[in-house]
């Protein structure tokens, strides 16, 4: 696989999450598409609340945000001793960990930095602080590199034509470029993307508010549909492939993604349409054996009872799962930053991690 484009050649958008001058800066995605605003967060608690209330969302983006939250703690802590600093670090870690339960990148990023701190606990305090900040930057930069690789891998296997996607797995869901976002941007540059169908993605409308905004901003040919129009669009032969993100992929290939993904997978099988998930290795949780083990976040009833701040339903009971789990049998392949994984997923995901540990680069 050859990297043909740089991030700047693929998108005009800035990074979704950044850290500078002892503050975390994030695009406020709750305001889009009405207003584009980068907000400053100067406390760990503020970063945690931004993750919880979906000011920042998307598994890789919240992982990077959490990492920068620990960097923020490291640079603003008033602890006078190493013991006091490490106690405060543990509290900051717990605050950030307890924000959202489904996306594995959050825990991956936090645990990566925590492990580093444990390994260097005998180092001078200033060195521990420096290592925390350095690692947070590495996590963010590696995400951009991974997305760039996934974009080029995905463009090699997806058919030319019309692609349908769900929710927002674009640049806004990551540090930059996106998982799905990188794939469709590379296809757009190559000329192989004819049309990008976007599900509106109720109840928070990430497809309508975020994907439609960011992809049209970068000049892609997009068309928005209601979620319940997807089956008809497939039936009419208007979709050549479906590509979605993944907040957590487990050892057998089952994966959690935005609510409504499972429905699309079943429809894709019925209509003979290739169905791909795109995610970096950091979104793959080999500790969980099947999708039944993935914790599913439930969110506020107000997300369903209201739309754009306006009440659209009476005050009735609501069930509002934020994610669903798609069984691996519906997957054509998993596009990762180390190549494309094909069935059988249980065997080939295991092989992917073995190859990656040995320094290899190609999936199977």
Swiss-Prot record:
Question: Catalytic residues?
Answer: 247 (proton donor)
Q: Which UniProt keywords apply?
A: Amino-acid biosynthesis, Isomerase, Methionine biosynthesis
**SUPFAM superfamilies for this protein:** NagB/RpiA/CoA transferase-like (SSF100950)
- Kindly state a single biological-process term from the GO annotations of this entry: L-methionine salvage from methylthioadenosine
Ribonucleoprotein as UniProt keyword: no
Q: Which Gene3D superfamilies match?
A: translation initiation factor eif-2b, domain 1, Translation initiation factor eif-2b, domain 2
Name the residues that bind substrate. Answer: 57-59, 100, 206, 257-258
* Substrates-to-products reaction catalysed: 5-(methylsulfanyl)-alpha-D-ribose 1-phosphate = 5-(methylsulfanyl)-D-ribulose 1-phosphate
EC code(s) of this entry: 5.3.1.23
This molecule's function is given as: Catalyzes the interconversion of methylthioribose-1-phosphate (MTR-1-P) into methylthioribulose-1-phosphate (MTRu-1-P).
- Protein name as catalogued: Putative methylthioribose-1-phosphate isomerase
- Species name: Pyrococcus horikoshii (strain ATCC 700860 / DSM 12428 / JCM 9974 / NBRC 100139 / OT-3)
**Lineage of the native species?**
Archaea, Methanobacteriati, Methanobacteriota, Thermococci, Thermococcales
């Amino acid at each position: 696989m050859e990297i043909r484009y740089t991030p700047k050649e693929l998108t005009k958008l800035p990074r979704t999450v950044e850290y500078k001058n002892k503050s975390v800066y994030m695009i406020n995605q709750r305001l889009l598409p009405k207003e584009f605003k980068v907000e400053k967060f100067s406390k760990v608690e503020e970063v945690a609340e931004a993750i919880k209330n979906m000011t920042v969302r998307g598994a890789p983006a919240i992982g990077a945000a959490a990492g920068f939250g620990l960097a923020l703690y490291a640079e603003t802590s008033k602890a006078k001793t190493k013991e006091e600093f490490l106690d405060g670090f543990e509290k900051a870690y717990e605050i950030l960990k307890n924000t959202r339960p489904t996306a594995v990148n959050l825990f991956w990023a936090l645990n990566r930095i925590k492990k580093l701190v444990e390994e260097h606990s005998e180092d001078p305090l200033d060195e521990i602080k420096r290592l925390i900040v350095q690692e947070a930057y590495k996590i963010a930069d590696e995400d951009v590199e991974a997305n760039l690789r996934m974009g080029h891998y995905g463009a090699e296997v997806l058919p030319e034509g019309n692609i349908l996607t769900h929710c927002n797995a674009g640049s806004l869901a990551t540090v930059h470029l996106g998982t799905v976002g990188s794939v469709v941007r590379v296809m757009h540059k190559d000329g192989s993307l004819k049309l990008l169908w976007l599900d509106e993605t109720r109840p928070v409308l990430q497809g309508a508010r975020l994907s439609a905004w960011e992809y049209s901003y970068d000049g892609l040919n997009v068309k928005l549909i209601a979620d319940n129009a997807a089956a008809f669009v497939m039936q009419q032969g208007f979709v050549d492939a479906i590509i979605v993100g993944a907040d957590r992929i487990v050892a057998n290939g089952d994966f959690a993604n935005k609510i409504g993904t499972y429905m699309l997978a079943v429809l894709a099988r019925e209509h003979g349409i290739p169905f791909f998930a795109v995610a970096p290795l950091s979104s793959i949780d080999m500790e969980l054996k099947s999708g039944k083990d993935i914790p599913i976040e439930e969110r506020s009833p107000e997300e369903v009872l209201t739309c754009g701040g306006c009440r659209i339903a009476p005050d009735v009971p609501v069930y509002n799962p934020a994610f669903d789990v798609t069984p691996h049998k519906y997957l054509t392949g998993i596009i990762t930053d180390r190549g494309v994984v094909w069935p059988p997923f249980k065997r080939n995901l295991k092989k992917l991690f073995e190859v990656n540990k040995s320094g290899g680069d190609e999936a199977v």
